[in-house]
Design a protein with these regions (language model features):
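Short glycine-rich, Thr/Ser-proximal phosphate-binding strand/loop in the N-terminal lobe
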Residues: 12-56, 228
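Catalytic phosphate/nucleotide-handling subdomain of diverse soluble enzymes
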Residues: 218, 224-256, 265, 329-362, ...
Length: 405
């Protein structure tokens, strides 16, 4: 069976067509600048990759161009869209309504609209993608896979905020967590690599990139995660502040005489590595500046590594131990120096990485590389995440549960 995986932004459409027999990517691509001038599509298939100009007034036209690329020319991988068995959509926020992936119905779409205030930048774009896909692909089943779903196993003591309880009851104010699809994929891949059932493992998964989150996964269930009601919470990120004293918000608002929207822009887009270093939101640029003697860049790097280390320690305490630490995401997979600094002085917890294995992990050309030092009790893994494949797997599972296979 073939599943089309979709990740829609307000002006973009990312896609992969996966043949589930062998879990092979047949093609992938990106439609950019939807609704703007100079729209374009990049399509990769059969060893060819090409970017061509296009006209995308809406996501519907973008999907139509994706179909054209998949069925004609050098990028052809199918004869007709009828060969596609289902479409899996990444949806950022499922709130408490959706604790697992589900078949998309008109009722589901309406509920997603109701949840849009929880993710105003992401859920409306996801709905646009779903509705456009239904127009272009007709009766092909559509499945929603939620970033928040894997974290829905958190107990109330982990997800509740210590504010009046009625705000949770009336407005859904609580910790939800994000990057769930990535955390789920690397958790199961770690269990597979370790040759242990996931329900016997205590894992800490670190998805580190421009956006970063950490999850404590005990026996296959998330018991805590670093992001909160929104992806702004948790560890500092490329441009996001992460956890700060809530009183700072009001203090800055009145001191700077700015609106809530302006403050939101500062905390989401001008903070984190960029705000502290004054150099860049990209960890590589920050590290280069630090190496050149920039003290603020060094501070930003030290802060991030320290915060991640502190979170790992707290999650070990929460779970009463840990079997493996997993690094994934752009920083987690490629930044050996950060991995080394995060794990430094954690020998007393049984965590120690091999210097050579860590430094050469990127050269192994494997989706899982173990960097555990000899004698360390806790295994340390670098795992290449694959959110698209996880979405495809969830989509296939939903079809099976609905009797549509």
């Amino acid at each position: 069976m073939k599943i089309l995986v979709i990740n829609c932004g307000s002006s973009s459409l990312k896609y992969q067509l996966i043949d589930m027999q062998g879990e092979k990517v047949l093609c992938k691509g990106l439609c950019e600048r939807i609704g703007m001038e100079s729209s374009m599509i990049t399509h990769e298939a059969n060893g060819n990759k090409a970017t061509t100009p296009a006209i995308f007034p809406t996501h519907t036209e973008a999907f139509a161009e994706v179909v054209k690329k998949m069925t004609t020319g050098d990028g052809k991988v199918i004869d007709d869209v009828s060969e596609i068995n289902a479409i899996g959509h990444r949806v950022v926020h499922g709130g408490e309504k959706f604790q697992a992936s589900c078949l998309i119905t008109p009722e589901v779409i309406e509920t997603l609209r109701e949840l849009s205030p929880l993710a105003p930048l992401h859920n409306p774009a996801g709905i646009l993608g779903i509705e456009a896909a239904k127009k272009v692909f007709g009766d092909i089943p559509n499945v929603a896979v939620f970033d928040t779903a894997f974290h829905s196993t958190m107990p109330p003591k982990a997800f509740m905020y210590a504010i009046p309880y009625e705000y949770y009851e009336k407005y859904g104010v609580r910790r939800y967590g994000f990057h769930g699809t990535s955390h789920k994929y690397v958790s199961y891949r770690a269990a597979e690599y370790l040759e242990e059932p996931i329900d016997r493992l205590k894992l800490i998964t670190c998805h580190l990139g421009n956006g970063s989150s950490i999850a404590a996964v005990d026996q296959g269930k998330v018991v805590d995660t670093s992001m909160g009601m929104t992806p702004l919470a948790g560890r500092m990120m490329g441009t996001r502040c992460g956890d700060i004293d809530p009183s700072v918000v009001n203090y800055l608002k009145y001191t700077l005489n700015i609106t809530g929207h302006q403050l939101d822009e500062i905390l989401n887009k001008k903070s984190g590595l960029l705000g502290v270093s004054g150099v860049s939101s990209d960890k590589r640029d920050v590290e280069a500046a630090a190496a050149a003697g920039n003290p603020r860049a060094q501070l930003a790097s030290d802060m991030l590594n320290y915060q991640i280390k502190k979170t790992i320690g707290s999650y070990i305490a929460a779970m009463g131990g840990v079997d493996a630490i997993v690094f994934t995401g752009g920083i987690g997979e490629h930044d050996a120096d950060s991995r080394a600094k995060i794990c430094h002085h954690m020998d007393w917890l049984g965590i120690r990485v091999d210097t050579d294995k860590n430094a050469n992990a990127h050269k192994q050309n494997k989706d899982v590389v173990e960097i555990t030092a000899w004698g360390a009790k806790v295994r340390t893994l670098v795992i290449e995440t694959n959110e698209e494949l996880m979405i495809a797997r969830d989509t296939k599972e939903v079809l099976g549960n609905e009797g549509l296979l």
